[in-house]
Amino acid sequence: MRRVLVVRLDSDGDVLLAGPAVRAVAAGADEVVMVVGPRGQQAAGLLPGVDAVEVWRCPWVDGEPPPVTREGTEEIVDTLAALGADEAVVLTSFHQSPLPTALVLRMAGVGRITAAPGCSTT
């Protein structure tokens, strides 16, 4: 079974805009798990193709971030590792880097990671 994580850690609107990407991923996956921030959780549950939702209050994306700690990092690495994903697609806006998230995913044992940073129209 091919399980793919789609990561979009922003708000509901940003998660909804990820809908076409989620559907494209779902077309080639057996299961899609959407990894979102708390402000995007409601929208993730509405998207076609999403089988499960995992909420992560990511310290470098959240508007009121928790501190970055060893324990917090180990906790999300363990949570993501337990999902047993074969692949992850990291979606960000133009002002965010996908690299910290990709590092956490690699630490969780995700073998293939694709990042698609957003682009600015200005």
Q: Where are the regions that the model predicts?
A:
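Catalytic machinery of carbohydrate-active enzymes
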Residues: 1-122
